[in-house]
Swiss-Prot record:
It comes from Clostridium botulinum (strain Loch Maree / Type A3). GO terms for biological process: double-strand break repair via homologous recombination. It comes from the Bacteria. ATP binds at residues 8-15. The lineage of its organism: Bacteria, Bacillati, Bacillota, Clostridia, Eubacteriales. This is ATP-dependent helicase/deoxyribonuclease subunit B. The keyword 4Fe-4S applies. Keywords: 4Fe-4S, ATP-binding, DNA damage, DNA repair, DNA-binding, Exonuclease, Helicase, Hydrolase, Iron, Iron-sulfur, Metal-binding, Nuclease, Nucleotide-binding.
Length: 1147
């Protein structure tokens, strides 16, 4: 019985010494068991290395074990375990059930139990307890030593959960974490390790469970050899936590304590002092880094480096692209093998997709060394979404998550048809499950013939029944089921009914045929995982009563804990992984990417359920558990040291200065430390682009990425930028390559691409727009915004997918409709706005809205609680609006005379006729919300009011550009009709926008009712253009003094109008605007009929017509594309507008 340490710094040859020692023992033909004990993740590599040292005949005499493998061997030898092992998934499901049953008994974790990830946290702490040999009884016995209430209650909760977990678990199962505890007991009966010599390698520390196993082995074996990565032995002395080797020296001290307690001999240690070390025999620089990285003081290396390099990049993508180029260069120019290269990072999740994308493009074979979660696998999504459909009452999201898994007998076209219908009509809940066919006809924005619509509706119902039949059967079969076992049985029958096992097998075969080995391996494991999860539910809680929602949660918890481990599909490939999973053997070249602050070294982890103070307190009371975050942070130094000393030939560290969102990233402290040691370190960056053939050669690697660089350089050449001659040779290579010639020709044609098509044939445009042209004024304004958007919307009639929701335009139309009906009700009853009873008016608004809802004219407002709230808001807004309109009318002499005045063939007035220069007549149609009239001095003055649900400003500049024409053309049309049809002398009074709203008043507590009303009136002040006549202004606001709070006017003390603070125009200016609007509309209509469909959106200081345009994916407007330019509209001052208008009219 003895212990021997084999120690040395990284790369000194400790592992090789163990292998050579084993070989020597075999050659000496010593009759004793020879064991190599390594961590589980290194067992495969250790076996491989041992076989390389030993020949095939002698290799069988040695066993390579991990602690887990050792446990299984002993259990097979002496027996003692009859129960099955429960995996992490089963543990989580069992813990979920325990916490649900005890949630009312928990003191601290009652609320936390509902949070996502809590089950995993509890599972982790129980694992920690077991590894530190802590039982529920030990926790309970120590409670009296805990004075602090919060910690005491925490430990009580943990003891309760832990105790019930142990009780329920051991009915049918055993926890994986119990293996080593049982191993300690069974080793007394085992003969396998009697007089054995054991070599223990690649460990930096052990858990208390593992120390207990080692103690037993030390008492049974001939000798245990343990490798320690350290520069010297501590021999039981105090350990400085800041020492990079402190974790190793702590391990040494604990081992020394064990042999001292058991009177076991300590053999003379083997010191592997080397200069240079075996690993770094070909690199003085890497040897220097190993010696000085954590040495104080350190020794500077002043020569230029070639084996250690740094790279600063613009972002993560260019960082990985540069890494790929460097790998290709090393393999191409220096004969390196992909299998000798590793790329690691402290943020694998953030880099994984980028590495996959770039390495595939550069044809670099790679394997990402990580376990894959299964939550996003379509099979798991199918199972969970099927149960979610039933537990969440058939919501759109859950139903289509289920349907879109690709595992049901419904194709994509059928799915799209069904989805469009469901979205358009808000199908949910019982509408899916009742036998009655769907009869809604509004499933598109297009008007279809009755027969076509009937056929499409029949098809939709056929798709619905086919798609929903399996899940409706599942729903029926789950009725009246209460126990977990019954739920599992019904779910299994459902999966078989949709032929899932056969479909999975077909998918595996397809993946293999397409060379997607990793995908095939993943799907090969999924069905077994599903069955294992169901089995563990049945075994652990099968007889317990649960609800469907609980069953869904338990399954979700179980699947979330599963991770699939994949075997590398080939040997010669780059290993990509995280720093914590780095396999240290046989890596010649190492790329560490993302060497940024907060990534490498890793930041302090969150403290978890037990804080650092809690752990310190418990440790002081003799209840030792895992290290606190500060201790782990000190151990991170050793991880950094181990990582930097892994490669034997070449190390490159790279760091981006910004992440994918453009946020600044700082380089890690490691970068500055290494720069101090290596004062002339090889340092590159891609931020400052250098010119020259050598730099261009760096971009020439694999065919695909080089082709992208060729595109960039050809574009520069076309734009007149001088490019390097080498790109001519590159172009020639692709041109002469059969595979690339077609792509190259498409590329060349692409340089002449433009998305513009300025005009189309007049005949075609006539077919699209109709003849004679009959359009609304708002459509004319739309054409002014962008001719192409107009063409797509009104020519091609392209529309958004119809969704069952309430848009702002829908709401606006609804409110207009209610106001119109209310106005006509006033007329019918002979009630004036300024004398109406407000209580009656509010009741009338309620009545009109309720009638609309009863008639289902706006069915959506009855569809949910949210829309009930919207309905209440609409009622409040309309009640506020009718009060406001009444206040406005009380303040003036204008009287409402027309509501929803229409211009159309069957309207109040005929369409507004516009004769083009060709003699053709264009008919404009439209509707005015309200027209108020004033009879004064033999003339009739018009006040035209447009109700708006949003804020709308009146800008002369927009009138000039054809963006704001409606009110002016309506004014012109009414004045013309009054004069020509009725001989009435009409005059412009005002053009106004009235916002329909119920604004929030601030500081309402300190205000009287009158002050509140005044604030609301001021808040909802109308915008527009007023006749510059003080008398007419008085007829609109008879209490005006200074700035009016209802119209955009300010009067001076002498009664005159302050033109600088008012939006006013004289009669002559109104006349000019009438002429200009007609001129502009004629000009726009002629452009329209000539076939102008140019992609030319306007752009102003406050935005562009592209901002809310739904057709951007159609036009693909981009100022980088030839011929794509904004129609820049400069906001003009009013005086500039008047000048410009006069000039145009004079032409």
């Amino acid at each position: 019985m003895s212990l021997r340490f084999i120690y040395g710094r990284a790369g000194s040859g400790k592992s090789q010494y163990c292998l050579n020692s084993i070989k020597k023992r075999i050659e000496e033909d010593i009759d004793r068991p020879l064991i190599l004990l390594v961590p589980e993740q290194f067992s495969f590599q250790a076996e491989k290395n041992l076989i390389e040292v030993l020949d095939e005949k002698t290799g069988f005499k040695t066993q390579v074990l991990s602690f887990k493998r050792m446990a299984y061997r002993v259990f097979n030898e002496v027996g003692g375990i009859t129960a099955k092992h429960m995996n992490e998934s089963g543990k989580s499901m069992l813990l979920y059930n325990i916490i649900e049953d005890n949630k009312n008994n928990l003191k601290v974790f009652k609320k936390a139990a509902k949070r996502q990830g809590f089950i995993t946290t509890i599972s982790d702490i129980i694992t920690e307890f077991k590894r530190y040999n802590i039982t529920p009884e030990i926790i309970l016995n120590n409670l009296e030593n805990i004075e602090e209430d919060n910690l005491k209650y925490k430990m009580e909760d943990l003891a309760l959960i832990f105790s019930q977990f142990e009780t329920r678990l051991h009915k049918n199962y055993i926890d994986n974490e119990d293996d080593l505890t049982i191993l300690v007991e069974k080793l007394n009966k085992s003969k396998q390790f009697d007089n054995a010599e054991i070599w223990i390698d690649e460990f930096s520390s052990f858990s208390p469970q593992e120390y207990s196993v080692l103690e037993k082995l030390l008492l049974k074996s001939y000798r245990i050899n343990i490798t320690l990565c350290t520069d010297y032995l501590n021999q039981g002395r105090f350990v400085d936590t800041t020492d990079v080797f402190s974790p190793i020296k702590n391990t040494e001290n604990k081992l020394l304590q064990i042999i001292e307690d058991n009177n076991i001999k300590l053999d003379k240690p083997i010191a592997l002092n080397c200069d240079p070390c075996a690993r770094f025999k070909n690199s003085i620089e890497l040897q220097h880094l190993e010696k000085n990285m954590f040495s104080f003081p350190y020794k500077e290396y002043k020569n230029e480096t070639k084996d250690i390099c740094m790279l600063k990049t613009l972002n993560q993508f260019t960082e990985i692209e540069n890494t790929a180029k460097d790998i290709i260069k090393l393999c191409r120019d220096k004969g390196c093998r992909f299998k000798d290269i590793a790329v690691i990072t402290g943020d694998l999740e953030g880099y994984e997709n980028i590495i996959s994308s770039v390495f595939l493009q550069y044809n670099i074979p790679f394997f990402i060394d990580k376990k894959r979660e299964i939550n996003n696998n379509p099979i798991i999504v199918l199972i969970l979404s099927a149960l979610e459909v039933l537990s969440k009452n058939w919501t759109y999201e859950s139903v289509f998550r289920y349907l879109k898994t690709g595992l049901l007998d419904i194709n994509n076209e059928e799915m799209d048809i069904l989805e469009n219908y469901v979205l358009a009509n808000g199908i949910k809940g019982y509408q899916w499950t009742n036998d009655k066919p769907w009869e809604h006809k509004s499933f598109s924005n297009y008007e279809l013939e009755d027969q076509v619509e009937k056929e499409l509706l029949a098809k939709i119902n056929d798709i619905r029944y086919k798609a929903m039949e399996p899940i409706i059967s599942l729903n029926k079969n789950l009725k009246n089921k209460e126990r977990a076992k019954e739920f599992c049985e019904v779910l299994y029958e459902f999966l078989c009914s949709i032929n899932l096992p056969d479909k999975i097998q077909n998918m595996i075969e397809d993946f293999r045929a397409e060379g997607e080995v990793e995908k095939a391996s993943e799907y090969n494991q999924i069905w077994n995982i599903v069955m294992e999860v169901l089995d563990q539910i049945v075994e652990a809680i099968g007889g317990e009563k649960i609800s469907l929602k609980e069953f869904f949660k338990i399954l979700q918890t179980g699947f979330s804990e599963y991770e699939i481990g994949l075997i590398p599909p080939t040997l010669d490939q780059v290993i990509v992984g995280s720093i914590t999973r780095l396999r240290s053997h046989n890596i010649n070249i190492l790329y560490i990417v993302g060497v940024n602050d907060g990534i490498f070294p890793a930041p302090l982890k969150e403290e978890g359920i037990l804080s650092d103070d809690d752990r310190q307190f418990l440790g002081d009371k003799g209840l030792e558990i895992a290290k606190d975050t500060k201790s782990i942070a000190f151990e991170e130094q050793f991880l950094v040291y181990s990582t930097l000393t892994t490669p034997s030939k070449y190390l490159r560290l790279s760091y981006p200065i910004a992440d994918g969102e453009g946020k600044t990233l700082r380089p890690s402290i490691i970068i500055s430390r290494i720069k101090k040691i290596f004062t002339n370190i090889c340092e590159e960056n891609d931020i400052v682009k250098l010119n020259g053939e050598e730099e261009e050669l760096k971009n020439i690697s694999s065919a695909k990425p080089t082709f992208n660089y060729l595109i960039s350089n050809l574009r520069k050449d076309i734009e007149g930028v001088k490019i390097d001659n080498i790109w001519g040779d590159i172009y020639k290579w692709y041109f002469e390559n059969e595979f690339w010639i077609e792509k190259l020709n498409r590329l060349v044609k692409g340089f002449d691409y433009t998305n513009q098509s300025k005009y189309i044939e007049t005949k075609k445009i006539r077919n699209l727009y109709g003849k004679p042209l009959k359009i609304s004024v708002s459509r004319v304004e739309k054409f002014s915004q962008c001719p192409f958007a107009y063409f797509v919307q009104y020519g091609l009639k392209a529309k958004d997918r119809k969704i069952f929701n309430l848009s702002y335009p829908d709401l606006g139309i609804f409110m207009h409709s209610i106001l119109e009906k209310f106005s006509h009700e006033l007329e019918k009853k002979g009630i004036d706005w300024d004398t109406m009873d407000l209580n009656w008016a509010e009741e009338e608004i309620d009545k009109l809205i309720n009638e609309e809802l009863d008639n289902k004219s706006l069915d959506i407002l009855n569809s949910s609680k949210r829309y009930e709230y919207v309905t209440k808001s609409v009622k409040k807004i309309l009640k506020r609006s009718i009060w406001l309109i009444g206040e406005h009318i009380k303040r003036g002499n204008f009287k409402p005379s027309y509501y929803e005045l229409s211009f159309d063939i069957d309207g109040d007035y005929p369409p507004i006729a516009m004769e083009l220069h060709s003699g053709e007549v264009v008919n404009l149609i439209g509707r005015v919300d309200r027209v108020d009239l004033l009879q004064k001095d033999g003339a009739t003055y018009l006040k035209i009011i447009d109700y708006k649900s949003g804020t709308k400003e009146f800008k002369l500049s927009d009138v000039y550009y054809g963006l704001q024409l409606q009110l002016l053309i309506y004014l012109d049309a009414i004045l013309t009709e009054l004069a020509e049809r009725f001989g009435i002398d009409g005059e412009p009074g005002a053009l106004l926008y009235l916002k329909l709203d119920d604004p929030i008043v601030k500081n309402i507590v300190d205000m009287s009712d009158k002050e509140i009303e005044k604030s609301i009136i001021k808040n909802l002040k109308m915008k527009g253009l007023i006749l510059n006549d003080p008398n007419i202004i008085k007829d609109m606001d008879n209490i005006i003094s200074g700035i009016s709070d209802i119209i955009p006017v300010m009067v001076k003390k002498d009664g005159g109008v302050s033109e600088g603070r008012s939006s006013v125009a004289t009669k002559e200016e109104f006349e000019t605007l009438r002429k200009y609007v007609r001129y502009t509309i004629i000009e726009i209509c002629e452009e329209m009929l000539e076939g102008n469909i140019e992609i030319k959106p306007y752009k102003k200081k406050d935005g562009s017509s592209c901002d809310y345009c739904i057709y951007s994916s159609v036009c693909k407007f981009d100022t980088e594309i030839r011929g794509n330019k904004y129609n820049i509209l400069i906001d003009k001052k009013d005086e500039e507008v008047w000048e410009a208008i006069k000039k145009k009219l004079e032409c």
